[in-house]
A protein has these predicted regions:
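Phosphate-binding loop of NTP-binding sites
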Residues: 4-5, 14, 21, 28-34, ...
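Structural beta-sheet core signal
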Residues: 38, 140, 180, 219, ...
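Conserved N-terminal Rossmann-fold NAD(P)-binding element of oxidoreductases
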Residues: 12-17, 446
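Beta-strand->loop->alpha-helix junctions that form or flank phosphate-binding loops
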Residues: 39-40, 58-61, 96-100, 141-144, ...
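Short acidic low-complexity segments
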Residues: 56-68, 427-433
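C-terminal helical cap/extension that packs against the catalytic core
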Residues: 332, 380-439
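NAD(P)-binding Rossmann-fold cofactor-contacting core
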Residues: 35-49
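Nucleotide phosphate-binding/pyrophosphate-handling subdomain across enzymes
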Residues: 2-13, 21, 25-28, 32, ...
Length: 466
């Protein structure tokens, strides 16, 4: 394993260590022999696993925690007023953002990064599964738990590093991968990009141009925003999607006993490949296809690609299916991280495709006041399509409330448009579920805030079938 260029920094402290982007980086650093400490507001199962590796993690943020640190790595969610960050600045301790550390960790490897508004966690995980299946033992850092291995990161023995690239705060520009995927570009995180879709699009151009001249860029040309930026990218492009304008075109899709079968046509060479996936939804066919394109570019055999797809069991909180039993009645419970209207619609379509005759009840926790404001009408359009909607309060994610933006107002607009929404809390949601279990067959917990805790409580309360 090649050495890193910052071995002199023995003691590394990570502020916000439990975040989905931080935990994987911390794990890799600890396994690479660094002494890692960290702080956060709560201890998650992932943090407990990190502590088992030897990392010291404290609840709360206190200046004394970093007195022995040589280097501080800060999550983008951390305020500039954080007491640890303030102390580090006064003490002239080197401070870097998480993405800069991730980019540094990538340098000794042949690196692959997956960016995009939607699908990047799933796509990154599929790539890791395929490379594992091919015996390449990749190192990877992903923003969700890979269910087949029960973790979001791995320090492998091979020459590849596979990472998820986060565009939400522009930090993916710290990465310089040799192979990159852009799954799609949607109108999300516009609060950071000054409400400008053009600025968001340009950030993806800049990300693509970070590739070396010999790098490969894999694009979904079905996406309108990607088509807009393509002319400004000067790297080798491999395209994928359902349209015939793509180099790799998805054709002849068929659903059989919960498995999606499809063919992939190389429109240049006319080669035709047959694949299948247990993942649900049209959006996941695009995710799978992106991963296949990466594998083909890296000369992985079709046999090993199919092996990796077969071994892939999904990602935590990405259309994660379980069964519960309420008063002797079996119900489907789906947990999904999606919090943008496009993602919610994809989840809803996948649910209806997989459980076509079932009635769906969704519990949705809107994420951020700014997102709810920017996409208010889009949320209304999607959420009116749900048989029964239970709305939790907006999860602020450190934002201040915005006048006129609330779950109550969202509910009113949904119901004005012939939707069926009610306001609930975590506790009253469980009560409603128990009292109305005859009225639905599929229960969906949807969102990126604390709703995963509600899903866990539902599983705890009602028997989970093995």
């Amino acid at each position: 394993m090649k050495s890193l260029g910052f071995q002199q920094f023995k003691q590394i402290h990570m502020i916000g260590i439990g975040g989905s982007g931080m935990i994987g980086v911390a794990t890799i650093l600890q396994k690479r022999g660094f002494s890692v400490t960290g702080s956060d507001l709560s201890i998650t199962p992932e943090v407990r696993d990190l502590k088992k590796l030897g990392s010291k993690v404290q609840i709360g943020h206190e200046p004394h925690l970093i007195k022995k640190a040589d280097l501080v790595v800060a999550s983008s969610a951390i305020s500039s007023r954080n007491p640890e960050l303030v102390f580090a600045k006064k003490s002239n301790i080197t401070i870097i953002p998480r993405a800069e550390m991730l980019g540094t960790l990538m340098k000794p490897y042949r690196s692959i990064a997956v960016a995009g508004s939607h699908g990047k966690t799933t796509t990154t995980s599929i790539i890791a599964s395929i490379f594992n299946g091919a015996g390449l033992s990749p190192t990877y850092v992903i923003g969700g738990q890979v269910l087949s291995v029960g973790r979001s990161s791995n320090l492998g023995d091979g020459s590849y590093m596979i990472v998820e690239a986060d565009e939400s705060d522009g930090s993916f520009l710290h990465l310089q991968p040799e192979v990159a995927v852009i799954t799609n570009i949607d109108n999300d995180h516009l609060d950071f990009y000054e409400s400008s879709q053009e600025k968001l699009n340009q950030s993806f151009v800049n990300f693509a141009e970070n590739l070396p001249f010999y790098g490969h860029l894999i694009l979904n040309l079905d996406d309108s925003n990607i088509n807009k930026i393509k002319k400004n990218i000067h790297r080798k492009i491999i395209s994928f999607g359902f349209s015939s304008k793509n180099q790799f075109q998805i054709i002849n899709t068929a659903l059989h006993e919960g498995v999606q079968n499809f063919q992939l046509l190389n429109t240049h060479s006319k080669k035709l490949y047959k694949f299948s996936t247990s993942l649900s939804g049209r959006h996941n066919l695009l995710n799978v296809c992106a991963a296949i394109c990466v594998a083909l570019e890296e000369k992985i055999s079709i046999i090993n690609i199919k092996k990796g797809l077969k071994n892939f069991k999904g990602v935590g909180r990405r259309f994660e299916i379980a069964e519960i039993s309420i008063s002797g009645q079996s119900k489907i419970l789906i947990d999904d991280y999606g919090h943008h209207p496009t993602e919610i619609l994809a989840t809803l379509k996948a649910s209806k495709e997989k459980f076509s005759t079932k009635r769906i009840c969704m519990i949705f926790e809107p994420h951020r006041f700014s997102r709810t404001k920017h996409l208010f009408e889009d949320f209304v359009k999607v959420l009116t399509q749900i048989d029964q909607l239970l709305l939790l309060d907006i999860y602020p994610a450190s934002e201040s409330p915005i006048r006129g933006i609330s779950s109550k107002n969202l509910m009113a607009k949904i119901n004005q448009n012939n939707g069926n929404a009610i306001l609930v809390s975590n506790s009253s949601a469980q009560q409603w579920i128990e009292e109305n279990y005859n009225d639905y067959d599929v229960l969906l917990t949807q969102g990126a805030g604390t709703i995963s805790q509600l899903n866990h409580s539902i599983k705890e309360k009602w028997t989970l079938k093995k």
